[in-house]
Amino acid sequence: MNQIERREFLKSAGLFTLAAAAAPHALAEAPAMSDATRVTLKGHLATVENHLHNGIIPFWFARALDTQYGGFVTNFDEQGKALPCPEKYVNTQCRLIWWFSTLKRRFPEMPKTAEMASQGVDFLIKNFWDQKYGGFAWKVKRDGSELDPAKIVYGESFCIYALSEYYLATGDKRGLEYASRTFDLLQKYAADTQNGGYYENVNRDWSPEAGGFAGGDRKGLDTHMHLMESFTTLYKASGDDLHRRKLLQVIGLIKEEMTDKATGCGLNQFDLAFSSLPAIPIKRTWNGERLGEKPADPVDTTSYGHNVELEYLMHLALKTANQEGDADRAIYRRLLDHAVKHGVDWEYGGIYRDGLRATGEAIVKEKEFWQHSESLVAFLDGYEQFHEPRYLEAFGKIWQFVQDFMIIKGVGEWRTLLDRQGKPIDPNIGNPWKVSYHTGRSMVECRERLMRLLA
C-alpha cells in the first residue's frame, strides 16, 4: 500500500485527519467588546494604516520598477538606496506582481497599480517562461538573459499565486492562462504519484535534482504550504473543480503528514515518503543562500513563523474550498497556542525564529522580518475567530517591537534581521528574497481584520 492508498484507507476509516482526535473547537460567539478593547483595536488600525499608506506602498512604488529593462529591482540598503541588482529571482518578481495586483483589488482607485503589475507580467513571460519545456526559470540576469533555468516548485507556486491574483485584479487572460499552464505542468512532472505531494527541486527539463544540498531527495512544509496558498488563489480565479480537488489534497497531506500529532506543530523536512528528517539548508532557498551547507538542525525543530503562517493560510484555503469544520479550527488553535506560549518573546517583544516542538524551547532567538509579518496576521486571525485575549496581546507585543526596531522611520520598510533585543544584524530592507510580499501583505491583511473587528 503506497502513501496515497494509505491516506485513502485512513480517510474511509474515519482516521485521516490529525484533528479527528482533538476536541472540537467551534467558532466562539463574539462577546461584547469592552471600551478598552475597542480603543486598543482603533489604535492598532491607525498605526497599521499609517505604515501601509505612508510607508510600504510609497516605498515600492518609488523604487521597484526597473526603468531600464522592465520587471522589478529588489535590492536596497537600510536607507532605501538602491544596491546592485545583477539577478532577478522568479519568486520576488512574482511577489511584486502579486503586490501591485492585490493593491489593485483592494484599493481600486489607487493609480498605476495595474500598470506596474502588467509590465511585471510582460517581463516574466518574456524572460522566465521556458519555451521548450514549459514552466518558469528560477532566475535570470537583470536584463532578462538566461542564468539559472532550473524549475523550483517553490518558485512555480509563486508564479501561480501572482498570475492568479493578477487575473482577479485586471481580467487579463494571460494571468489565468499561464497560472493554469504552470499548474498543469506541476501535475504532469512534479507530482509524486507514489507518495503524494510534489517533488520540489527539478532541472530545466523537469528531471529530478541530485540529493543532499541540491534538495532532490527531500520535501518540505514550506513549499507545500505555498502550493496550498497558490492553489487557493488559482481556484478563486478559475472556479475549476480540478484546482479545488488538488487544493484539498495538499491540505490533507499537510494535516496528515507534515504536522506533529503530539504538539500540532509543523515539521520542517522529510524524505520523499514523508519520514521526518533533520532540516538542512538547501540551495535555491532563503536559508541555503544565507547559510550554505551546514550541520542539520535537530529533527524536533519547528518554525514559529511557519506554524502561524500555516494557521491563516489553511483557514483561508478551507474557507475558499467551502470545506472547513470544527476539527480544522482545532488545528488552528494548536498552532497559535504553541506560538503564543513558546514563540512570542514576552520580555522584549517580537517572535523568535525557531524552537523545539516537544518542549517548546526557543533555540534561535533572533528576530527576522517575515516571522513578524506572518504572526501579526495569524494572531489577529485567531482573535477574530476565537476571541482569545492572549492572541490580541501577542499581536500588540509583536507589533510594538516591529514599530520600535524593524520599521525604519522615514524610509518605510523593515530591516531584515535583528538580535533578540532589536539590534540590527542585517539592516538592509530589500534583497532577492525580501520585497513587499510579507511586510505589505501583513499590513493589508491586518487592516482588513481590524476593520471587521471594529465594524
List the model feature ranges, each with a label.
Residues 27-455:
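Glycan-recognition and catalytic cores of secretory/periplasmic carbohydrate-active enzymes
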Residues 1-17:
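N-terminal secretory signal peptides and thylakoid transit peptides that target proteins
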